[in-house]
Regions:
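C-terminal ends of transmembrane helices
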Residues: 45-60, 142-146
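Conformational gate/switch positions in structured elements
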Residues: 40-44, 146, 254, 280, ...
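Juxtamembrane helix-capping/reentrant segments at transmembrane boundaries
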Residues: 57-82, 290-300, 329-335
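Hydrophobic side chains within alpha-helical segments
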Residues: 148-149, 244, 275
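Cytosolic/stromal cytosol-facing helical appendages immediately following the last transmembrane segment
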Residues: 2-15, 155-232, 266-410
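Transmembrane helix-loop junctions in multipass membrane proteins, especially transporters and channels
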Residues: 30, 51-55, 90-98, 146-150, ...
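Intramembrane catalytic core of multi-pass membrane enzymes that act on lipidic substrates
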Residues: 60-205
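Alpha-helical bilayer-embedded segments of polytopic membrane proteins, i.e.
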Residues: 2-50, 66-94, 105-136, 229-272, ...
């Protein structure tokens, strides 16, 4: 019983830390930087927990050990957490403007003599609050991703969460573009070899928005409805963000707008970073089946628990509507480290290319089809990946194992 409880509550890591980061913003002072500190703590923990883990598993009757109601309620709960986080940040913008950047009077002594909450916030700590908000609102987006694969109430929650994060196009573009065009030139979310994470961010974000724009244009034309219409899900999605924009503008005018733009910029950078890390450099010939090999998997402990198994990309792309706690490790190519580690590696492009080109060389040798190899050889010449040796990683031997690959549903 205790083991079953631990299997399920381990996925509360991110919600708890999101709430803690939000509390830091509310308290203000040096605590406004708590979210930034927690990001680096996450990196250390990710390094220390490189060991592999599994999903919740099944009992002797073949029934999942996952608590569906508990996990779904947790994901739904993240929407009010999102809203409260934004309200708290807007409050801090308001107090900054009202008191001219002074801390003002002590409102509450949380730990007498050690930790107090001031009425206002300094400019430096407002920067910390903004960065903390961007980081942990971005981390919370993983719940919007998970619910985008559901229908009904769950999808509405996802759509609202993504709209409040400045990424209203995501729910449709992710399901109807990324999951169908994965690792091909028609998928803006897949980063080709040689591209940096900084170059990928705007191209992926705008490319996915363009996809939904075009999809709605064609859909409404077939219906005989004007593009400028409430039925346009591209327009309607971005309008859902208007209350957030109004809130921050009312709180601090253009200072509020700058804070919101920074928060959205960071949170969406994290979202596109996940796309970048999960499929970087992988190649699929258009109209050929999507296979397990078209994903970089990860099943290290902290990444799996914190990011609710999002690292099991191969199984996720095969069974998109499967609950995250039921996803399995299917023996796919692996980047070797957890998401915190590879994210920080990706922030330094020369190190990232050095790190990944060796893994891509192994992928070309052990996983790619002849057609994919031909494309890879051409691209490798163009971006300077040609002739890269590979040694010293389990990926080298992975291609010699029968992975039992299934063709992903399209």
């Amino acid at each position: 019983m205790i083991g079953n409880i631990l299997l399920n509550v381990r996925y509360l890591l991110a919600p708890i830390l999101i709430i803690v980061a939000g509390a830091g913003v509310l308290i203000g002072g040096i605590m406004a930087w708590l979210g930034v500190v927690l990001l680096f703590v996450g990196l250390i923990v990710d390094i220390a927990t490189k060991f592999e883990t599994t999903g919740v598993g099944y009992d002797e009757n073949g029934d999942t050990l996952g608590w569906a109601s508990f996990q779904n309620l947790t994901m739904y709960f993240m929407l009010p957490v999102f809203i409260l986080f934004q309200l708290v940040m807007a409050y801090r913008v308001y107090t900054f403007m009202a008191l001219g950047g002074a801390e003002g009077a002590v409102v509450m002594e949380i730990i007498p003599g050690l930790l107090v909450m001031h009425e206002g916030i300094t400019a430096m700590n407002l920067i910390g609050a903004t960065l903390s908000s961007g980081i942990f609102i971005g981390i919370g987006i993983i719940y919007g991703h998970e619910l985008s694969h559901t229908k009904g109430f769950g999808f509405v929650i996802s759509r609202t969460m993504m709209a409040l994060s400045g990424s209203a196009h995501f729910c449709y573009a992710h399901v109807y573009n990324h999951h169908l065009e994965l690792a091909s030139e028609d998928d803006p979310a897949t980063a080709p070899r040689g591209r940096t994470i900084y170059g990928h961010y705007p191209l992926s974000y705008l490319g996915q928005s363009k996809f939904l724009f075009n999809m709605e244009k064609e859909r409404l034309a077939r219906m005989g409805v004007s593009f400028i219409s409430w039925q346009n899900r591209w327009i309607r999605g971005y309008l859902m963000a208007v209350p957030t924009v109004a809130l921050f503008f009312a709180a601090g005018g253009w200072v509020g707008m700058a804070c919101l733009a920074t928060i959205w910029g960071i949170s969406n950078f994290e979202l596109e970073a996940l796309n970048y890390l999960e499929h970087y450099g992988l190649i699929r010939v258009k109209d050929q089946p999507i296979d397990y090999r078209h994903n970089w998997d990860n099943s290290t402990a902290f990444t799996s628990w914190f990011f609710i198994e999002i690292g099991r990309q191969a199984d996720h792309h095969d069974r998109g509507e499967t609950h995250f706690w039921e996803l399995e490790n299917v023996g796919c190519p692996n980047t070797g480290w957890g998401y915190f580690v590879v994210f920080f590696i990706a922030l330094v492009p020369p190190i990232w290319h050095w790190y990944m080109r060796k893994r891509l060389a192994a992928w070309d040798t052990h996983f790619a089809t002849d057609e994919e190899k031909a494309i890879a050889n051409r691209i490798n010449k163009e971006v300077g990946y040609e002739g890269t040796p590979f040694a010293g990683d389990v990926l080298q031997d992975a291609g010699n194992v029968d992975l039992g690959m299934r063709t992903a549903k399209k």
